C-alpha cells in the first residue's frame, strides 16, 4: 500500500515524544508499505536531520517543503516577526501566553504548499494520506477526494486549551475564540475518513463531542528496551522538552509548589532539550538531550507532574519499559492502563505529590513492586510489535 504522511514534526532526531511516536511506528510499517513523508523545513526539521533519517530509511521517500518557499508567503514572515518580538519583550505577559496557547493551526495554507502536497500525492500513486498533529489538521480541506484520509491525533488541542487557558483567567473574548477553535477542530476531524487517537480516553472525549467519523485507538510505540528494576539511586527523573507547554507548566508546579514541601528533596534530573539555565539549581540538574536514555535515568523515580494537555505520555512508557517506579498526576496517566497503587502512584495536589515521593524514598520494596508492575503493563500492552499490528488494522479498513 502507498501511504503518504504529512507531518509538521520530522521523525528524527528522537528528542520529542512526537518524533519518537512517529519514528517507531513508521520503522515497523515501512517493511510492509511504501511510505512517503512530506514535512516543512524549519528550525526543528533541519535538512541535516532529514539526511540522517534518509540513511536509516533508504526505502522511505522524504519530501521537504523548503524554508525559502515558505518565506515567499507574506503571513509566514509577519507571524514569525511578531512572535519573536513578543518573546523578547513580553515573554511573561499572561495575555500573550493565552494567545500562544490559542494559536490557529500552524502550517500556513499557501497555494504553493498545497500544490506541493497534491503533486506528491499524485506522483506517488497514494492510496492513503495520513496527516499527523493538530497544526496540519486543516489540510483535509484541500486534499484530493479520491484518496482515503486518516488523521493521527497525538493530542486533542481543544482539551489542552481548556486545561491550559483556564489557569490564566481568560477574558470573554478569549473564551469565545477558544470555543470557536474547538468547533473548527471537531468539524475538520469529521472531514477525514478515519481518526486515530493514541488513547481510549481521547476517543471517548471525541465521541462525547459528537464526532461522527470512525475513531480507532492506536497507541504510540517507544524505542526504549525493556530492562529489569534497578534499586533507587536517590534521584528523581523528568523527561521532556522545554518547548512543550505542559512540560514547562509541570516543572514549574513541581519546583514552586511540591519541592518546598519535601523535607530533603532528592536531586531532580531533567532530560530534554531547551531548558534554560534558570531551572538549574542545588536540587535540579539539567541533562539536556541524551543519546542513551537508559544510562541517564535508570534507577531513578520517574515523576510526571503534568497538569494540562491530552494524548499519550511517552515518558510514562519509557519509565515502565525500564521498570522504574512512576509518580504522576491524573492528567499525566490519562488513557494509559497503569493503576494507582499497583503500577504507578497518582497524586494531584502538591501535598500528595510530595508525600508520594517521600513514601517511595523510604520504601524500597514498594519502589520495586511498582516498577515491576509497570514493566508488566508495558510488556502486555505497549510493545512495538503489538502496537504496529494495531496500526496496520487502521489501514486494512
Residue ranges and their predicted role:
Residues 193, 297-311, 322-325:
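Acidic donor-binding loop of glycosyltransferase active sites
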Residues 315-319, 325-329:
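Short hydrophobic beta-strand element within catalytic cores of glycosyltransferases
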Residues 78-128, 134-137, 170-191:
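Conserved nucleotide-sugar donor-binding subdomain of glycosyltransferases
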Residues 365-395:
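A charged, aromatic-enriched C-terminal amphipathic alpha-helix characteristic of glycosyltransferases
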Residues 3, 143-165:
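Active-site proximal beta-strand in glycosyltransferases
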Residues 344-351, 359-365:
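Conserved acidic donor-binding segment of nucleotide-sugar-dependent glycosyltransferases
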Residues 150, 158, 175-178, 186-227:
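Donor nucleotide-sugar binding/catalytic pocket of nucleotide-sugar-dependent glycosyltransferases
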